[in-house]
């Protein structure tokens, strides 16, 4: 039973236990999120390969394209989901049942409206999309695929989002991760079986949507069981402060995730969409693992801010920033080295499109690495609720991405859209680092610059250190052996450079690990 259902009790004892509780929840969230992302990555590699072999690049591109167009319904969210999660922090930290119930009720109403908007949006897409996509499939074929895919998205908005946001804000995101992981595993196993048995893509995607229907239902059951919310509460005014101020940040996030495939769908071919999708599943899979390592940190930032524990906040942010920069540099450098050998192995036997595009691989890797570097600064801004103050930069980021992608796609194709993504993400990352230093934790921007310079140095040293390796694996086993060699060398370089430039942080990390072993 969550804290909002417990009487106030002894405040001093609660304060003493609060730090321990936060640390324990952060651990559960981090482990749960990492497990979820690993499940996502494994599923993300298995299913597209089945699609490519069974249905070809055109169908794989069509599925990716439809999913991205449906993803644009998230624009109707208007950024409210981030603001809702931030709004939950204070009432949950202070055990305010009434205020928590009001936010839950207001949010639920809003997202049910979005669910209705989704139905209208899908109806419009069913008429317009077949006219803009370059394919030989009939309108009916495409529209039925749209309907099969959209069912799960509708259920998410109608039942699930508010409950998921409440759990994340209460540092119980691990519940969401457990439910989501089970759904993904079931979907992967059943979808592969259906494809193996030769069923049509429409039925495969329909079964997937039905499986994912269970997620929001289970969220609802858990929240109803563990939270004493007044779901019939009436209130005057809007309980969600700054409700619309997350709009700009939200537009930017949706544009970054969906623009590339939309631009390729309209101005290029489904084969290019399929190629983009294969590379994207690799880079986003790695990015998600890095970002998941920071799962629960926004809620912890929010809790520290709500309790005005600024010194703890600054110390924790410094460690978080160092950890994310180090992890991002290591993981994305290794991925940049291994991505082309992997694509060679992964697409072996697929001859209806050319999946070997090295320059695109470099640019899309850089873009997602920069996006991961943005994570600590973005999480702090969201936790502090500084939506309105940073919204102009969000519009600029989205504008750069769209404008450069559209201009460049005609001559450069996949490389052009990757350039647009990289430029938009780079601008936003540098802006947020500057804003944070000036307005939230008040520190010198040189901290960020130092991290970037050491990141760049690490990349070059790792690349020069592995020049002697052969990069032509002839199968998955050979690729795994290559990956182990590259990873060991890269890890050694990162440890050495961190001992030189971040000795204090490394010592603290070693002491923490030693302490955890003793307490285990």
Question: Where do the protein language model's features map onto the residues?
Answer:
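Membrane-interface helix-loop junctions in multi-pass transport and translocation proteins
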Residues: 52-54, 58-59, 174, 182-216, ...
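Interhelical loop/hinge segments that connect adjacent transmembrane helices in multipass membrane
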Residues: 2, 6-26, 201-205, 217-258, ...
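Helix-loop junctions and terminal segments of transmembrane helices
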Residues: 78-94, 163, 168, 227, ...
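Interfacial segments at transmembrane-helix termini and the short loops linking adjacent helices
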Residues: 128-149, 336-368
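Transmembrane helical elements of multi-pass membrane transporters/channels
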Residues: 28-45, 204-219, 223, 234-303, ...
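Membrane-proximal transmembrane or re-entrant/amphipathic helices at the cytosolic face
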Residues: 1-18, 466-520
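Membrane-interface junctions at transmembrane-helix termini in multi-pass inner-membrane proteins
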Residues: 23-27, 153-178, 197-202, 223, ...
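Signature of the first transmembrane helix
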Residues: 3-10, 22-90, 119-122, 148, ...
């Amino acid at each position: 039973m969550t804290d909002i259902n417990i009487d106030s009790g002894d405040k001093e004892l609660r304060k003493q236990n609060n730090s321990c509780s936060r640390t324990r929840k952060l651990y559960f969230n981090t482990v749960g999120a990492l497990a979820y992302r690993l499940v996502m990555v494994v599923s993300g590699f298995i299913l597209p390969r089945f699609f490519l072999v069974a249905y070809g690049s055109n169908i794989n591109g069509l599925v990716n394209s439809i999913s991205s167009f449906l993803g644009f319904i998230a624009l109707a969210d208007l950024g409210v989901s981030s603001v809702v999660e931030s709004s939950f922090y204070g009432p949950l930290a202070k055990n305010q049942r009434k205020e928590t119930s009001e936010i839950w009720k207001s949010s639920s109403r809003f997202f049910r409206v979005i669910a209705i908007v989704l139905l209208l949006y899908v109806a419009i897409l069913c008429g317009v999309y077949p006219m803009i996509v370059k394919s030989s499939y009939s309108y009916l074929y495409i529209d039925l695929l749209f309907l099969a895919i959209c069912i799960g998205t509708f259920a998410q908005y109608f039942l699930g989002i508010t409950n998921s946001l409440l759990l994340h804000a209460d540092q119980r995101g691990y519940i969401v991760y457990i439910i989501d992981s089970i759904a993904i595993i079931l979907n992967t196993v059943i979808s592969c079986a259906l494809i193996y048995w030769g069923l049509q893509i429409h039925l495969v995607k329909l079964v997937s949507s039905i499986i994912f229907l269970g997620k929001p239902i289970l969220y609802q059951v858990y929240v109803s069981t563990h939270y004493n919310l007044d779901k019939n509460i009436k209130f005057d005014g809007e309980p969600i402060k700054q409700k619309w101020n997350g709009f700009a940040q939200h537009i930017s996030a949706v544009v970054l995730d969906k623009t590339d495939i939309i631009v390729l769908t309209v101005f290029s071919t489904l084969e290019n969409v399929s190629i983009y999708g294969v590379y994207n599943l690799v880079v986003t899979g790695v990015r998600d693992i890095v970002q998941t390592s920071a799962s629960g940190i926004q809620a912890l930032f929010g809790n520290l801010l709500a309790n005005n524990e600024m010194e703890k906040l600054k110390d924790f942010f410094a460690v978080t920033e160092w950890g994310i920069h180090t992890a991002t540099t290591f993981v994305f450098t290794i991925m940049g080295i291994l991505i082309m050998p992997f694509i060679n192995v992964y697409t072996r036997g697929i001859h209806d499109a050319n999946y070997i595009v090295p320059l695109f691989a470099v640019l899309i890797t850089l873009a997602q690495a920069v996006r991961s570097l943005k994570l600590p600064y973005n999480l702090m801004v969201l936790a502090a609720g500084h939506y309105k103050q940073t919204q102009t930069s969000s519009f600029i980021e989205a504008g750069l991405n769209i404008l450069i992608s559209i201009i460049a796609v005609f001559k450069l194709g996949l490389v052009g859209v990757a350039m647009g993504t990289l430029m938009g993400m780079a601008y936003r990352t540098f802006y947020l680092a500057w804003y944070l230093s000036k307005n939230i934790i008040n520190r010198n921007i040189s901290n960020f610059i130092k991290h970037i310079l050491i990141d760049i140095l690490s990349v070059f040293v790792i690349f020069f250190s592995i020049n002697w390796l052969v990069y032509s694996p002839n199968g998955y086993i050979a690729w795994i052996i290559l990956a182990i060699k590259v990873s060991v060398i890269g890890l050694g370089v990162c440890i050495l450079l961190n001992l030189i430039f971040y000795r204090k942080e490394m010592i603290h990390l070693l002491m923490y690990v030693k302490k955890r072993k003793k307490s285990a």
